[in-house]
């Protein structure tokens, strides 16, 4: 299983939100590139990034930071947050990003998702943000009509390879991850699933590893010191 340490970007800084709430933001670093280099020094091969400003308004104000990390480290960079047009996908991928995550747009704009997969294949991933059993959109502010299963079924049929699945109720709360949900999903679908939200102790990593998931994202637990990144990477192997 691959470990994806995470950087959320806002105003060119590395920040974290509590349960997706923009009013509960903690700034962890003024220099995200330093954080990424630190991940790399600790043995990380992947990095998960979200542009929180982009998630709100569909722009790319942190593109230069993302490009820097893609080009000045050897990390596999995946980025999400407000990617709603082919122009934005092109921008990120030509800046050196390895994989782009479509969130709201994958739920609301089937044609866009289809053409993105046709053009870029495995470089396109989908973010499934789960709230009360349904897929949430628009920076977690709205609930869509899709249940989790209906959405996974559809994505698999459309040729999506990787889904980053977040239980919003667990995100940033440091109360553990939704093991039952990931266990059920990994048994039902042949997608590469990345667990996100609430991975807050090394035991969470061990439990997810047993399910043979493709990946797990570690965010707040890294910044607060609750998880040692090097140990998590070892345990996940």
Predicted regions: what they are:
Residues 8, 39, 47, 92, ...:
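Conserved, mostly hydrophobic/aromatic
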Residues 48-51, 78, 101-102, 125, ...:
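Conserved beta-strand positions in the central sheet of alpha/beta enzyme cores
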Residues 94-112, 197-201, 213-229:
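Glycine-rich phosphate-binding active-site loops on the catalytic face of alpha/beta enzymes
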Residues 48-93, 179-183:
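N-terminal active-site wall of soluble small-molecule enzyme domains
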Residues 46-62, 104, 165-175:
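Glycine-rich, proline-tolerant flexible connector loops at the mouths of alpha/beta enzymes
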Residues 12-15, 19-23, 98-171:
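Conserved anion-binding
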Residues 60-67, 110, 141-150, 175-183:
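Charged helix-capping and loop-helix junction motifs
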């Amino acid at each position: 299983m691959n470990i994806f340490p995470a950087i959320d970007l806002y105003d060119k800084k590395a920040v974290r939100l509590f349960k997706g709430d923009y009013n509960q933001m903690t700034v962890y670093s003024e220099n995200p590139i330093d954080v990424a280099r630190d991940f790399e020094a600790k043995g990380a091969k992947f990095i998960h990034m979200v542009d929180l400003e982009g998630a709100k308004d569909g722009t790319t104000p942190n593109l230069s930071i993302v490009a820097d990390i893609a080009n000045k480290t050897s990390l596999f960079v995946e980025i999400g947050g407000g990617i709603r047009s082919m122009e934005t996908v092109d921008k990120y991928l030509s800046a050196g990003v390895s994989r782009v995550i479509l969130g709201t747009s994958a739920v609301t704009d089937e044609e866009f998702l289809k053409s993105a997969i046709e053009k870029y294949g495995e470089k396109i991933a989908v973010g499934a943000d789960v709230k009360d059993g349904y897929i949430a959109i628009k920076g977690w502010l709205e609930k869509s009509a899709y249940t989790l299963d209906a959405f996974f079924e559809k994505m698999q049929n459309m040729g999506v390879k990787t889904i980053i699945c977040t239980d919003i109720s667990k995100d940033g709360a440091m109360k553990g991850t939704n093991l039952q949900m990931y266990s059920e999903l990994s048994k039902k679908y042949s997608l590469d699933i990345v667990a996100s939200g609430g991975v807050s102790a090394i035991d969470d990593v061990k439990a997810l590893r047993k399910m043979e998931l493709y990946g797990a994202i570690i965010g707040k637990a890294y910044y607060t010191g609750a998880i040692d990144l090097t140990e998590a990477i070892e345990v996940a192997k």
